[in-house]
């Protein structure tokens, strides 16, 4: 090899090196511009929304999407504000086809973002009046604590193994439902609006979450820790700001009514989900539960406005299964901590309403307790009610209180004292639909199962 060849080869190697460095630098810059996401939510028959968060230096965002196998892609630009401290982005897609697979790409400052996971979603099927209700599954869980040592309490870290989210991402399901305490505000967070925004943004950005969020649509309620301080109630001075932040970081269909609360509703197949808000309207737990021997009608758990909405929504529902979703347990009579049981006026009102109007198929779905269980409430002359509690995802595990260790309401073999999530599957022919609950551990192992037929939660 002569000197010229040596110089030529050296030049080629150098050019490859420079190209690699530039490519790596551009990829690193792109990744820094994308804080978290993207993921698809509120996926309906002909519409969907895409969520992501970008950094302060980003000036514009758009996405391209197409049905799977199609050559032509559509472009939608984000028209909202950017270049702020926190920049959650929502882009709505309309005019879609039902029961269709879609793929999408994110572009930040005209650069396509390369991601280690697929970005896709499937619109709902138009099954009504045409075919049997589709079988489906969904995931659910509560209490996601992300460690940040400088702001955490001294001692052992409260947050657990976040690999549970990789397990959830790999578990086939149509959507995931967050049951509250989806992040944990600390003392440094809930004393300012900026602090609330920081916590939501910081915890959502964790790498372990990204594949789960992208793998299926996400729905959510909140509890105290992602609303404000521990056991927070209607007195929290930043409750309106907290509501806005929650709405910024999730893609629920709506967010309360009249700019109050976060309650909403969605449907999948022959199931309706009533996502309640147990914080915005809530009275303090220690307010008198009864006055002169009568339930105190001024002590609110859901509040009058939300209770009226819930009752009317239940009356309107024709679903086989009606899931009332709450951040706190509802039916556990031995729960000494936060529970709707301690708000007897609203609790009695709701149960009497279910009885009077013969509302069938009701299942309560709750979080908060740092252990899982299924609670049964027998009712004279009516079907029993069930409360499925799923907790925790990554926060600390807690045993039941001594007073409820041998709770006669608890279904046998459903006490779960480890990190877990639930997979709930609805299947079967019309009038013989069944619900199967699997408690699944962080490594994907099935810890316990429970099953019930629609006939068992129907007034005969």
Regions found by a protein language model. Name each.
Residues 29-460:
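Metal-dependent phosphoester/phosphodiester hydrolase catalytic core
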């Amino acid at each position: 090899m002569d000197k010229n060849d040596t110089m030529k080869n050296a030049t080629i190697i150098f050019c490859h090196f420079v190209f690699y460095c530039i490519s790596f630098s551009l990829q690193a810059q792109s990744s820094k511009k994308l804080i978290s996401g993207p993921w698809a939510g509120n996926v309906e028959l002909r519409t969907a929304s895409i969520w992501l968060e970008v950094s302060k230096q980003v000036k514009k965002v758009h996405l391209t999407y197409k049905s799977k196998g199609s050559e032509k892609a559509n472009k939608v630009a984000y028209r909202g504000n950017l270049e702020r401290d926190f920049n959650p982005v929502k882009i709505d897609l309309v005019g879609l086809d039902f029961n269709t697979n879609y793929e999408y790409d994110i572009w930040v400052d005209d650069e396509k973002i390369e991601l280690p996971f697929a970005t896709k979603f499937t619109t709902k099927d138009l099954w009504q009046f045409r075919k049997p209700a589709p079988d489906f599954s969904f995931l659910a869980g509560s209490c996601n604590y992300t460690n940040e040592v400088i702001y955490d309490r001294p001692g052992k870290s409260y947050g657990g193994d976040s690999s549970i989210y990789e397990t959830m991402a790999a578990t086939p399901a149509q959507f995931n439902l967050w049951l509250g305490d989806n992040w944990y505000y600390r003392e440094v967070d809930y004393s300012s609006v900026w602090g609330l925004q920081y916590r939501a943004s910081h915890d959502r950005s964790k790498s372990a979450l990204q594949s789960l969020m992208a793998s299926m649509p996400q729905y959510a309620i909140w509890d105290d820790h992602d609303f404000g301080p521990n056991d927070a109630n209607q007195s929290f001075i930043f409750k309106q700001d907290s509501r806005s932040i929650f709405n910024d970081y999730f893609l629920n269909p709506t967010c309360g009514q009249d700019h109050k609360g976060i309650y909403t509703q969605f449907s999948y197949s022959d199931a309706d989900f009533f996502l309640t808000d147990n914080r915005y309207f809530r009275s303090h737990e220690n307010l008198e539960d009864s006055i002169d021997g009568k339930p105190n009608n001024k002590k609110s758990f859901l509040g009058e406005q939300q209770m009226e909405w819930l009752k009317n929504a239940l009356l309107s529902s024709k679903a086989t299964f009606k899931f009332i979703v709450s951040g706190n347990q509802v039916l556990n009579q031995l729960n000494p901590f936060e529970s709707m049981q301690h708000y007897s006026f609203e609790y009695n009102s709701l149960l009497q309403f279910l009885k009077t109007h013969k509302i069938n198929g009701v299942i309560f779905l709750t979080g908060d307790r740092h252990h899982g269980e299924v609670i049964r409430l027998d009712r004279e002359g009516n079907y029993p009610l069930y409360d499925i509690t799923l907790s925790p995802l990554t926060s600390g595990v807690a045993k039941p209180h001594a007073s409820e260790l041998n709770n006669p309401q608890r279904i046998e073999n459903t006490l779960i004292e480890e990190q877990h999530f639930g997979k709930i599957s609805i299947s079967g022919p019309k009038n013989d639909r069944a619900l199967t609950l699997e408690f699944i551990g962080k490594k994907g192992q099935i810890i316990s199962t429970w099953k019930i037929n629609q006939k068992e939660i129907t007034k005969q």
